[in-house]
Amino acid sequence: MICHTYKCIFIHQRKCAGTSIIHAFDLDLSNPDWHFMNDGVLSREYKSAPAGYFRFSIIRNPWDRFVSGWKYLASTRDQSLPDVLARLPRKGADYRHLTRPQHAILYDKHGRLIVDYLMRFESLQRDFDRVCDLIGKPRRVLARDNRGDRSHYADYFDDDTRRMFLRHFGRDVELFGYDY
């Protein structure tokens, strides 16, 4: 999402409260700018991003994000966790919601973070208030859009599924400092 009024770019990570952020900017979703960099297509779009715009995104505990995506997607919600982890989607919306690691769209090919500020899902409102202060936008209470009803992520994992998970998402755990 790009917002020219506040000169900012929000990189939308799936299952990380992105819809709540987009709604907080009251953007016309029919405008093509709202989805600028929305799926982390960084090569061409990143280079053409307006100079001086504040870039931000949200990260989320990788285990919690995965469970949220797993339970959200119609194609996976009725499968067991071991089955989903053994056959992770490799393309399309299911890939973006479930399989793509968070770091894959937040770092460029040289390993540099491409945003100025990383919000944390776990401190969403506080971090959004900070972003608002930095860009000069009046603070606003975020809506809780697309919230699922499920157990705590730790209720789903055992030692085997944790190992399977870390083979694919361990870099997110390491880079963003999350603990199980």
Range-by-range predicted roles:
Residues 1-180:
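Membrane-interface amphipathic segments in extracytoplasmic regions
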